[in-house]
Amino acid sequence: MSQSYINVIGAGLAGSEAAYQIAKRGIPVKLYEMRGVKSTPQHKTDNFAELVCSNSFRGDSLTNAVGLLKEEMRRLDSIIMRNGEAHRVPAGGAMAVDREGYSEAVTEEIHKHPLIEVIRDEITDIPGDAITVIATGPLTSDSLAAKIHELNGGDGFYFYDAAAPIVDKNTIDMNKVYLKSRYDKGEAAYLNCPMTKEEFMAFHEALTTAEEAPLNSFEKEKYFEGCMPIEVMAKRGIKTMLYGPMKPVGLEYPEDYKGPRDGEFKTPYAVVQLRQDNAAGSLYNIVGFQTHLKWGEQKRVFQMIPGLENAEFVRYGVMHRNSYMDSPNLLDQTFATRKNPNLFFAGQMTGVEGYVESAASGLVAGINAARRFNGESEVVFPQTTAIGALPHYITHTDSKHFQPMNVNFGIIKELEGPRIRDKKERYEAIATRALKDLEKFLNY
């Protein structure tokens, strides 16, 4: 390798983690960060790995998927986790940090590392054939975004404003739903939740009066330009929903349907459709239900949908400005691009959602960029681990319906043998297996 260093563009959570992982393997890094030269509407400081909104890294228990991911990252010597631990603040069962102390500590450690050169400058182009990790975040500057768009052949770098909730299939009451595609076109691909007129009217009332989450000031314009939230549709009138995402036409009841219906009508008054969200078929998203309701309100209102009364939401709907790639078509599980194995991406632009997930993607991308620099084969972590399941999901899910994803137990490879019915025990078993498999993988 004639190259004497690796470029890392962006010093957020993913970029800081990637730079550290590369440097700890004895490879020089040029870390570029435009803050200090050009500011963004979200950031308040020029520090690295700044937490823009919440100061929480979410749940810390191993019965929580993000808790498992954090533990795996600790075992992989994550700079983000280590400094987060050093600046924890009380937060019950969650891991929250003193955001300023934490980001200052990450910044100081990066600056002091003898193999990391920090360059405060805006990068407007992708460096040739040099090994590079791009981790410029959800609001990549327009100039670099255009170059990434070109790199993808005009495809795969999108702005998104919404994501619909995702539920665990095992928590859906299958006695109240039926499998069917509209007009029976193709194979039956949707789970349909039928509503009577009475059920729909109660649902509509709940939706129009539910409390929305506050928007950050820098999100407002994009919010109104983007996809229409389901609660906004509801406020525009009943017909907006009945001719939109809850359209019942072509979704007649099956002959053996025994649930409630309006008289002898063969078609429900309204239908909520659920679409398979992962290859394993363990997750389903609520089609067309992008939303900005508060999470508690989402649970209350969406559990009014027949079949979802006891549904477990592995991801709630979100509404904010973001940019992300068509990772299923563009990236390998190593976070390298398929067209150019010297070019890696990390962070939210790859379709991972959340602070911890972004840092985890930087960790994997950094390790693999370093291995490529050294002429070694890249590593793919086991799908039984959280840090292996996340890149597998974003690179193997259906590209047409791909949306950013938090880590959750639904994307981790299922346990072998009979299903453990107790959820806590099941998650504990998944976590125990994950940490054992990670240890074996690292010692292989």
Curated annotation (Swiss-Prot):
List of residues binding FAD: 10-15
Chief location: cytoplasm
GO BP annotation list: tRNA methylation; tRNA wobble uridine modification
EC number(s) per entry: 2.1.1.74
Subcellular location: Cytoplasm
Catalytic EC class: transferase
Pfam families per record: GIDA
Record protein name field: Methylenetetrahydrofolate--tRNA-(uracil-5-)-methyltransferase TrmFO
Source organism (scientific name): Streptococcus agalactiae serotype III (strain NEM316)
